[in-house]
Amino acid sequence: MEQLILQEEKKPNALAFKVAISFAVYSIVLIYLLKLLGIDSTNPDLPIAEKIIAMVLSYGVFFMSIIYTQITHKKELGGYITYGRAFSTGFKVAAYAGLFVGLLFILYYKVLDPNALDKIADAAIEKANGNEQQVKGIEMMRGYMWIFTAFGAAIAYTLLGLIISLISAAILKKERV
């Protein structure tokens, strides 16, 4: 009964929102940091070690953001949290982060670095090895790539966060007896 009252009083929404915004800003900063270090994650010829570093810095921090929010909310609830509440908390972070990362990718590709998508398209054309249909398809999609990239990132982060939230909620749940 006491846990239900605490759950009604303390909602994870504000915490999830703050963590998701922080992660989205971190993602943009990470893009520029990797560029500064000479690691272009859009380069198809990027060495495996650099790809792993970029993925760990991106997805690893995303996973930690979800788990951090679940643990913090569990502490707010007095050290107890139901599976459903832990999952909901993690999924809110994932959904918000997906939305914010998608919006920041739009900002990045349309305002901050419009040439980034041209580099990706040029690399895809080069990889097509003169296949006329592939080149024509890439050229047709060039103007819409920013939409697919932003939408794809939003969906990917949300779905990945859903899976992480399911797993971490099972680990972190602790109900009063």
Identify the residue ranges that each predicted region occupies.
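Membrane-helix interface/capping segments
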Residues: I66-R85
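Functional transmembrane-helix hotspots
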Residues: L103-A128
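Short membrane-interface loop/juxtamembrane segments of multi-pass integral membrane proteins
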Residues: A124-M145
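Transmembrane alpha-helical insertion/packing segments
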Residues: M1-I66
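Hydrophobic alpha-helical transmembrane segments of multi-pass membrane proteins
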Residues: I53-G60, Y108, A150-T158
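Membrane-water interface at transmembrane helix exits
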Residues: L30, L34-G38, Q70-K74, L104-Y109, ...
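Transmembrane alpha-helical segments in integral membrane proteins
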Residues: M64-T69, F148-V177
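Selective transmembrane-helix segments that form parts of the transport pathway or gating/packing helices
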Residues: I21-V25, G90-L103
